[in-house]
């Protein structure tokens, strides 16, 4: 009879845990209850143990959801970023930024400038990934893609609503700002986005052109000045003026392609010469020894 009551109680408990949306506790409580009985845990320790696992699993699922919605390019991490190739970027400063905290709470911005291939997008995505792992929400998008979506929203009289929906992201990463066409319709929705997030939600921008060339993006000088003013206020700026990583890799591969075997060895040229000279000397010595003991003809 006792087993029947236990079975009914366990079934009811499972239903209640489902209603309370506690799937991890529902899965783990039997094994923790057995351990608690075996080791004589007080009730508080038992409840604390299963609650801790529930919270940890919720945090894990939340990070997975945030990673899925962020659309980050794969494989871009701070661990794989070549800080030594971009000496003007402080690794310590980047690590502090990747923690989030105060600058995101203030709606501050991060601006990354430099020629194509210098690692701007990699660094932006890597910071975004670290922020998600620290509990923040991030969206990574090509600037042109987002601008086109906002233009559609404007035509449907939904621009304000579309911009408001982006407020759920603590950080909006706009990649390749320079590729926005110099068109009043496109740049105006971009300006409205920048204005709406000013001092409220953070923006990170990667761009090939410095501010002095932003008249190529914003056709209206007054709009250019206003956009720059809002972005620079409370901003951290990285000037990544280095040679393209892709170009460096291609040139390195070209230098190594088709080299003779001698150039592929790890031995130095002087060591190779010395070894060849030694082999030559040994050959001469062997020939001399052979000549000495050769019997003379009669």
Curated annotation (Swiss-Prot):
InterPro entries: AAA+_ATPase, DNAC/IstB-like, IstB, IstB_ATP-bd, P-loop_NTPase. Residues 276-298 are annotated as: Disordered. PANTHER family: ATP-BINDING PROTEIN RV3427C IN INSERTION SEQUENCE-RELATED (PTHR30050:SF4), CHROMOSOMAL REPLICATION INITIATOR PROTEIN DNAA (PTHR30050). ATP binds at residues 114-121. It comes from the Bacteria. This is Putative insertion sequence ATP-binding protein y4iQ/y4nD/y4sD. Disulfide bonds: none annotated. Keywords: ATP-binding, Nucleotide-binding, Plasmid, Transposable element. One of its GO terms (molecular function) is ATP binding. Belongs to the IS21/IS1162 putative ATP-binding protein family. SMART domains: AAA. One of its GO terms (biological process) is DNA replication. SUPFAM superfamilies: P-loop containing nucleoside triphosphate hydrolases (SSF52540). It holds the Pfam family IstB_IS21.
């Amino acid at each position: 009879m006792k087993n029947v009551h236990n079975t009914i109680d366990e079934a009811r408990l499972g239903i209640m845990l489902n209603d309370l949306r506690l799937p991890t506790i529902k899965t783990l409580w039997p094994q923790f209850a057995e351990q608690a009985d075996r080791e004589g845990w007080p009730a508080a320790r038992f409840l604390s143990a299963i609650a801790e696992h529930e919270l940890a699993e919720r945090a894990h699922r939340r990070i997975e959801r945030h990673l899925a919605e962020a659309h980050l390019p794969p494989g871009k991490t701070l661990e794989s970023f070549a800080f030594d190739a971009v000496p003007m970027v402080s690794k310590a400063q980047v690590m502090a930024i990747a923690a989030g905290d105060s600058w995101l709470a203030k709606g501050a911005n991060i601006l990354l400038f430099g020629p194509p291939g210098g690692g701007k997008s990699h660094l932006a995505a890597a910071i975004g990934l670290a922020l998600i792992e620290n509990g923040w929400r991030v969206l990574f998008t090509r600037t042109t893609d987002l601008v086109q979506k906002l233009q559609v929203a404007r035509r449907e009289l939904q621009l304000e609503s579309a911009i408001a929906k982006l407020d759920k992201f603590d950080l909006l990463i706009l990649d390749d700002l320079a590729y926005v066409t110099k068109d009043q319709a496109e740049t105006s929705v971009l300006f409205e986005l920048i204005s709406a997030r000013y001092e409220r939600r953070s923006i990170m921008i990667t761009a090939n052109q410095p501010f002095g060339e932003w008249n190529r993006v914003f056709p209206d000088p007054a709009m250019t000045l206003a956009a720059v003013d809002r972005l620079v206020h409370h901003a951290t700026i990285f000037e990544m003026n280095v040679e393209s990583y892709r170009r460096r890799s291609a040139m390195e591969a070209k230098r190594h392609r088709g080299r003779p075997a001698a150039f592929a060895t790890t031995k130095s040229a002087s060591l190779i010469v010395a070894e060849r000279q030694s082999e030559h000397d040994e050959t001469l010595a062997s020939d001399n020894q052979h000549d000495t003991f050769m019997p003379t003809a009669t």
